[in-house]
Amino acid sequence: MEPAWAIGLMTGTVLDGNIDIAMIRTDGEKVDAFGPYKLAPYPPELPILLGRALEEAAKWRFQGQEPAIFREAEAALTQAQALAVCDFLRENGLSPGDIKAIGFHGQTVLHIAPKDGRRGHTRQLGDGPLMAKIVGADVVYDFRTADVEAGGQGAPLVPIYHRALLDRIGGGCETAMLNLGGVGNISWFDGDQMVAFDTGPANAPINDWVKRHGRGNFDTDGRIALSGTVDEARLSRLLDHPYLNAPYPKSLDRNSFTADMAEGLSLENGAATLTAFSAAAVGRALDLLPERPNRLLVCGGGRKNPALMAQLRRRANVQAMDVDQFGMRGDAIEAECFAFLAVRSIRGLPISFPQTTGVSKPMSGGRLAPASARNAA
């Protein structure tokens, strides 16, 4: 197909109160052009509602009926993101007919990886048909369920987009891409070989630790961590966690590693220790790769944390660089990814692979809420 404009939406597990909206022109194989990008705020009450949904999800764990709050949160989230897309289109002089599709990831409230022969489970809040009705464009949503039902991890899905980005700059096996969101995930390529998995915690436990102490939603510029001292004995114990040395493919839920890891430490020392752990976990991940890269291109919010980036260079023994230095948009990459995956889904191209999620064969994913069915209704 000819490259077409698509919009991607992403809200991470850090619950920072924002929606990432990004537009790219793509055929689902290459990125032809980058369009506008916007960080749109949620209504102030929505992060609170989503936080309650996450709490209920942690209790539920796919046992029995879904918590009633899911329906309320899903409708509120979908409406907020749909209205943000409408504003985005209007601000950029666009109409729904100008875009091929919207890639709507939704909000992950619970993700349980497969284990000991048991299939995993995943739940993202996001009503594709409702968004299609509000915006007036085709919507691709529910990207992870098909992979999980086929025995895969359901994550990470971003590697195929990371590959398209690295192809633009000629990155080889000595370069990998690292996303630092709520959790960390890495993508590494060597010719046709592709490896990707979740490295461990990234921003989520640090943010939760800071919130717990009433110091805001995150460690601004890493100042709290930089004013503290890493508890090396605690860090050593944390690095004994079996996940870190487990073979890939593997994936994590936001709550797989929590702020409780720093319990008993001061605010500053806890932040420093959690930051060091997130970085050291990346080092363990690099050791698992077929060939250890010497350069990491870092995207996601974590790249803006000087304490985390410094610990990455020290604890992971790697050159860690902001992807913005390479003409990419580090804040937009995950949203761009779901625009890319939406087009791949429409074309029936795979979005998950044996080397990334452990699914038995490359497979497509996502469900389509088409404009024709919506308009007919």
From Swiss-Prot:
Gene behind this protein: anmK
Residues engaged in binding ATP: 12-20
Alphabetical UniProt keywords: ATP-binding, Carbohydrate metabolism, Kinase, Nucleotide-binding, Transferase
Pathway listed: Amino-sugar metabolism; 1,6-anhydro-N-acetylmuramate degradation; Cell wall biogenesis; peptidoglycan recycling
Taxonomic lineage from the root: Bacteria, Pseudomonadati, Pseudomonadota, Alphaproteobacteria, Hyphomicrobiales
UniProt protein name: Anhydro-N-acetylmuramic acid kinase
Main function: Catalyzes the specific phosphorylation of 1,6-anhydro-N-acetylmuramic acid (anhMurNAc) with the simultaneous cleavage of the 1,6-anhydro ring, generating MurNAc-6-P. Is required for the utilization of anhMurNAc either imported from the medium or derived from its own cell wall murein, and thus plays a role in cell wall recycling.
Catalysed reaction equations from the record: 1,6-anhydro-N-acetyl-beta-muramate + ATP + H2O = N-acetyl-D-muramate 6-phosphate + ADP + H(+)
Signal peptide (from-to): none
UniProt superkingdom: Bacteria
Assigned protein family: Belongs to the anhydro-N-acetylmuramic acid kinase family.
